[in-house]
Amino acid sequence: MYDSIMSISARNALSRLSETVAEKGVGSTSAPQAVPAAPGASFGEVLSQMTDSVGQKLQTAEATSIQGIKGDAPVRDVVSSVMEAEQSLQTAIAIRDKIVQAYLEISRMPI
């Protein structure tokens, strides 16, 4: 069942986006910046961590749902797990939409 969830377009789009960002080096500290960059993860790493987190929450929700169907998990845990996964997925979709919107806006800028 998790394989069918993985085919969700938002998950695939975020995965491809994080791979592209990691390959291109977008967000690396080598680019000139007006303000010194604080030590931390690059933009690509953050996106990669986010997609991994969403996938993990979807897996947890699926496992909890299966336990609930078997009668091994209380309904409250099942609902909580599914709602958390849904919220993570909605957040990922919103971030994807903002990234696409920013890309389109930048691509329309005159050079």
Swiss-Prot record:
GO terms for molecular function: cytoskeletal motor activity; structural molecule activity. One of its GO terms (cellular component) is bacterial-type flagellum basal body. It is found in: Bacterial flagellum basal body. Its main location: other. InterPro entries: FliE. GO terms for biological process: bacterial-type flagellum-dependent cell motility. The keyword NADP does not apply. Transmembrane segments: none annotated. Keywords: Bacterial flagellum. Belongs to the FliE family. This is Flagellar hook-basal body complex protein FliE. The gene is fliE.
